[in-house]
Each structure stands twice: as structure tokens, then as C-alpha cells.
Amino acid sequence: MQLDEVRHGLEAFIADEIGAQARLGSLAESDGHAGLTFLFEIVDGARTLPYVIKLPPRGVRRSGNTDVYRQAPLLRALHADGLPVPDVPWAWEHEDNPWFGLPFIIMERLPGHTFFVWDPAAGVSRDPADCERYWTDCVTTLARLHAFDWQRHLPDWEAPMELEREITRWERIYAQAPEPAWARAAAATERALLDSMPAALPFGLFHGDYQPGNCLYQDGSLVGVIDWELSGIGAQLLDLGWLLMVADAAIWTPGWMPVNPLPLARVRALYAAGRGEDFDHVDWFHALANYRLASIACLNVKLHRTGKRHDPIWEHNGRSVLPMYERALALVAGA
């Protein structure tokens, strides 16, 4: 969807749903994930209110991360429970709306900045004390999110994800690796994970891409968690493993190292303190995270190199594909 289409849709939406006294202010495209993401403002009298709208691409089957509407009940439930996520004042589940002809959600736009750990944006502090707070708040907030009572608040939101499926679903992704050695390493890692698969506890809500780059910080403190496209119900240690993988200097290459990560043992300790329990099998989930990101890189590096989706970041990640699979195998062997 082009910017002008979104502009016309929002102008009509504001007139219909808010009133003639309100108007569309600024509008800009943002970095989305599976869908289309735009930042905009509603000017209503003396108030200027910032929002985010997410829409799916046209012609794509609505499933999983391309079903943007599924985030609406989740974010509303989390927000109502006092957790740091944006509220969703408007959402439309089906295509039969007069504004966009697509499902959409409109979220409040929270203040603050993200902390993309490999290459923080200009103006984001790299001071070790500030970075320590970014990482610490990220871990402790994860423990709070995992304590969310999904069975009470979202019992029918999502079919639980079986852990075996979380391993095998990446086969068709890593099969597209541009380098045969990557696909061979992926298959070996998949077999090792399946052969050592633990009981998937604790079980509940997971984010799916939890790291400081998907958190918002203001005045040094975490104020929001965003980008819930990959969320689901399943093994929550997926998120802890992912955070450990992001912080793990063993897999990253010079020039693409995470900025001032906490030691891995401290990440685990902070999470355990927040949950009131130290969990088994954390190393296995750390290995799974390496396998997941390396497999995702197999596809995205191919798309970048063939010119189908220009994104130089994946060349950085591509240099870590084999180290990630090797690290996963070592973690499984030692788990």
C-alpha cells in the first residue's frame, strides 16, 4: 500500500470515527515486519495525538505474523493488566471496511527510543551504565511479561505452539540457503535439537523476538515493548534463549558485536529472580535461538544477495550463520 493510499484512508477514517473537527497531521512510513507500518498524528483541537497503524500486505494469506489483527486482543489484554505495551484504540478484523479494504490495527505510539544492540541509532547512549540499565530492564520486564495469566485473560486467543513444530517449521526456510554448507549445518542442528528436546516448561505467552531493539526506553528506563508479530502461546524459554543469543559475543563477528551486553550468567540470574524460579534446559533454548536466527538468515541473505529484498544488515548476520549453528550444537551437547 502506497503512502497516498494510507493518507486517504486515514483522512476518511478520522472523519468517520472521530469527527469533522479532527484532521490527519503528519504521516510517515516506518520499518515494519511482515506487514506495513506507518506513523501518524491525529490533530483534534489543541491536542496532537501520535499513533501507529499496521496493515498486512495485499494478497498475502492472513496467518501467524501476517495476521496483524491478532495483535489487537493481545495488546489490549496486556495493557489492561498494567504491562508496558501500546494500547489499541481501534482495530478491524476483516477486509470489509471502507477505509483500507484490509484488516488493520491502530496503536498508541509510545515515547522513547529503541536500543538496536549491534548498531544503536545516533543519539542513543553507549555509556556502559546506560547500556546496563537497558539490558537489565529488558530482562526484568521479560519476567513480568511471562507472568501474564493468558489462561484467564486470553484463553481462546491462540492455539498453543508445539515445541517440535517450532523446530521443524524452519526446514523450508533454511533449505533456501545461498551456501550449501549452511543448509547442511542447519539440518545437523535440527536433528540434534529434536533428539534432545526437553519438556516445554514454563508454558505461556512468548514474544518471539524479545531483545532491547524491540523495547522502548525513555530517560534511561524501559517504557514499552513493541513488535509482537511473532508472539504466541508455548514454551516461554524461547524468549530467554533468544535474549541470551543476542547477548552472546561468541557468535558475532568484529564490527557487528552487541553493545555492552550483560554477562550471560547475569541474564539468567535476573530472569530467574523475576520469575522466582531457576529453570532447567536454558542452554537448550539458547541453542534453539541460534538455530532459529541462523535459519532465518539463510533466507534473508539469499533475498538480499539476489536483489529481491535489499537489506545489508543480513550480510552482517550472514557472517554469523555457521558460528550460530556451531554454537547451537555445542550448547546441546553440554545441556
How does the language model describe each region?
Residues 1-22:
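Juxta-kinase regulatory segment immediately upstream of eukaryotic protein kinase catalytic domains
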Residues 277, 281, 295-335:
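Helical subdomain adjoining the active site within ATP-dependent kinase catalytic cores
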Residues 27-188, 196-202:
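ATP-binding pocket architecture of kinase catalytic cores
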Residues 238-275, 289-307:
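Active-site activation/catalytic loop segments of kinase-like enzymes and analogous catalytic loops
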Residues 203-205, 223:
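Conserved protein kinase catalytic-loop anchor
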Residues 205-207, 212:
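Catalytic-loop of the protein kinase fold
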Residues 226-231:
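Activation of the activation-loop gatekeeper triad in protein kinase-fold domains
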